[in-house]
Swiss-Prot record:
The protein's name in its UniProt record: Methionine--tRNA ligase, chloroplastic/mitochondrial
Superkingdom, natural source: Eukaryota
Location within or outside the cell: Plastid, Chloroplast; Mitochondrion
Motif, 'HIGH' region: chain positions: 78-88
Phenotypic consequence of gene deletion: Lethal. In heterozygous plants, aborted ovules.
Native source organism of the sequence: Arabidopsis thaliana
């Protein structure tokens, strides 16, 4: 994959390191699962009312999380049959914002992502591109790392299922499940979807035995395979979901999972006799382990350290169980049904939550190369920069639901919110401060805001943003931060400090305080928006006179009013977000995209947002 694509100078900065400064504040209340599955007891008997439930809550009551508890967050391990697409980028952007928020709360975060590199589809894709499987996996896996860097994804662990340490964990896990009597050998005949790498029930297929996910006909196969006794875990899984309804989120995804289980669980094949590219089944090198039985264990193998012993006991000691599996809804069954049953069989704790988000469409249509309407993440971030891409998808898509992208909507949103509401407010205020106060704050922001209702408004909106971040309501969190910006703009317009400065005397003194208040609003915005748009937040912080090291040490407590101090010198005003402008001669085409045809292109242009005539 080519080297990292250069992004807009104003919308992209160097890759931000995660910040890990402790914070004395209420931690995110993902409650620790207090039970461990033992092979000595019936599985369904281990859920007593005396045990704490495995679920997430965002109530204001004291959390049951132990001090210093690790927050482990995972994306799926992405399949390397093809380069990353926008759906994968969306999942990872969301995960990164959650991880950054948890770090702001002072949590030790382990953010895991990686690539799933075994299976028939990988071998086929490699051959089609004239490569052997290892070469193909190296190339595509690196493309994911490159995209994550471009999007300012601050992951902690990147696991590849071709890593030797992963294979060691998979084989030990397989041996545990086998020893528990949950693996047996049998012949299987059925309809197989190569793209899903899964046998399908006829009742779930479309006309002509087409897979409902890939719209391609399934093929008839007969194999001698090893099977996992999933049916044995129907009652335990029903009990888990009944006692811990927040185990699967959003709630309508829980309903889907309960429906699958209620319809009856069937044992599933966990090996392939016709696939060479995979981890060999222990004691039977003629078969390889099914890609999903393999890949799910990447969430555990990622926890191991290269210089430590590679076994399950060591791996789980570094942070298992996961606090949150963040996935697309298309792989919900694997994570909410197969994976918990596998963990129970191996005597390991379950993850605390599985969150299945929706799909993305473009201009209201499903994306596809045949339609000529694919959305390429590399091109998008090259064109608009990471802040715009991150903000749009987290702000515009209600997390959990399906969402739609259109370039026209994208440009309108990021220009209105980031360039105008946030960027222009900062630019105007710093301009007035330079002209009238030599870029120096006259008093502490706490003193300036005495008796000013705006301070209370901002504090309420900060709490609203925090609650929404905790609830994984990322769109609502963005909206709360934007409301802070709107409140700051309203205050600026109502107070009209440019007019007060012209009055002189006490009026000018009040105007100088007004500028301190507005800049404190901007400082709070920079902290509260940093999980979503870290580079933009850094640029705001820098113009307020802070260093990058100071920004990297912020915590959520820095959203508390009172950070700016009298005598603090601000930097020269310059646009913190490049306004996106349509190419004028192509504007009409841009507003009316035609499927399968290239339309006019938008461009990023820095627009100096000068003060109004009255302000000047």
């Amino acid at each position: 994959m080519a080297a990292r694509i250069n992004t807009s100078l104003h919308n992209a900065l160097s890759f931000l390191k995660p910040f890990n400064t402790p914070l004395n504040t209420k931690p995110f209340s993902f409650r620790r699962n207090s039970f461990r599955f033992s092979k000595k007891l019936p599985y369904y008997s281990q859920f007593s009312s005396g045990k704490r439930a495995l679920y997430c809550t965002s109530s204001s009551q004291e959390s049951t999380v132990d001090e210093g508890e690790t927050f482990v967050l995972t994306t799926p391990l992405y399949y390397v049959n093809a380069p990353p697409h926008m759906g994968s980028a969306y999942t990872t952007i969301a995960a990164d914002s959650i991880a950054r928020f948890q770090r702001l709360l002072g949590k030790k975060v382990i953010f895991i992502t990686g690539t799933d590199e075994h299976g028939e589809k990988i071998a086929t894709s490699a051959a089609a591109n004239g490569r052997n499987p290892p070469e193909h996996c190296d190339l595509i896996s690196q493309s994911y790392r490159t995209l994550w860097k471009d999007l300012d994804i601050a992951y902690d662990k990147f696991i590849r299922t071709t890593d030797p340490k992963h294979e060691a964990i998979v084989k030990e896990f397989y041996a545990r499940v086998f020893a528990n009597g949950d693996i047996y050998r049998a012949d299987y005949e059925g309809l197989y979807c190569v793209n899903c790498e899964e046998y399908k029930d006829e009742k779930e297929l479309l006309e002509n035995n087409c897979c409902p996910v890939h719209q391609m006909p399934c093929v008839a196969r007969k194999e001698d395979n090893y099977f996992f006794a999933l049916s044995k875990y129907q009652k335990p899984l029903e009990d888990i979901l009944a006692q811990n309804p927040r185990f699967v989120q959003p709630s309508y995804r829980l309903n889907e999972v309960q429906s699958w289980i209620k319809s009856g669980l069937r044992d599933f094949s966990i090996s392939r006799a016709l696939v060479d590219w995979g981890i060999p089944v222990p004691d039977d090198d003629k078969q390889t382990i099914y890609v999903w039985f393999d890949a799910l264990l990447g969430y555990i193998s990622a926890l191991t350290e290269d210089n430590k012993q590679q076994n399950l006991e060591t791996a789980v000691s570094f942070g298992w169980p996961a606090s949150l599996h963040l996935i697309g809804k298309d792989i919900l069954r694997f994570h909410a049904v197969y994976w918990p049953a596998m963990l129970m069989s191996a005597g390991l704790e379950l993850p605390k939550m599985v969150f299945g988000h929706g799909f993305l469409t473009k201009d209201g249509m499903k994306m596809g190369k045949s339609l000529g309407n694919t959305l390429e993440p590399f091109e998008l971030v090259q064109k608009f920069g990471p802040d715009a891409v991150r903000y749009f998808f987290l702000r515009e898509v209600e997390f959990g639901n399906d969402g739609d992208y259109s370039e026209d909507r994208f440009i309108k949103i990021v220009n209105a919110h980031l360039a105008n509401t946030i960027g222009n407010l900062l630019n105007r205020t710093l301009g007035l401060l330079k002209k009238n106060c030599e870029s120096t704050l006259v008093v502490d922001s706490t003193v300036a805001a005495e008796g000013v209702p705006l301070k209370d408004t901002v504090e309420k909106l900060v709490e609203k943003a925090r609650t929404n971040y905790e609830n994984l309501s990322l769109s609502s969190a963005c909206e709360a931060v934007l409301e802070i910006g709107n409140a700051g703009n309203t205050y600026m317009d109502q107070r009209a400090p440019w007019f007060l400065f012209k009055q002189g005397g006490v009026s000018a003194e009040e105007a100088a305080k007004d500028l301190v208040i507005i800049l404190e609003v901007m400082r709070v915005i920079a902290v509260a928006l940093s999980p979503v748009a870290p580079c933009l937040s850094l640029r705001i912080y820098s113009q307020l006179g802070y260093t990058e090291d100071q920004f990297n040490s912020i915590t959520w407590s820095d959203t508390k009013w009172g950070g700016l101090k009298g005598g603090q010198v601000m930097e020269q005003a310059s646009p913190v977000f490049a306004r996106i402008e349509l190419n004028p001669e192509k504007e009409e085409d841009e507003k009316k995209p035609k499927v399968g045809k290239k339309t006019g292109k938008a461009k990023v242009k820095v627009v100096e947002q000068t003060p109004t005539v009255a302000e000047a």
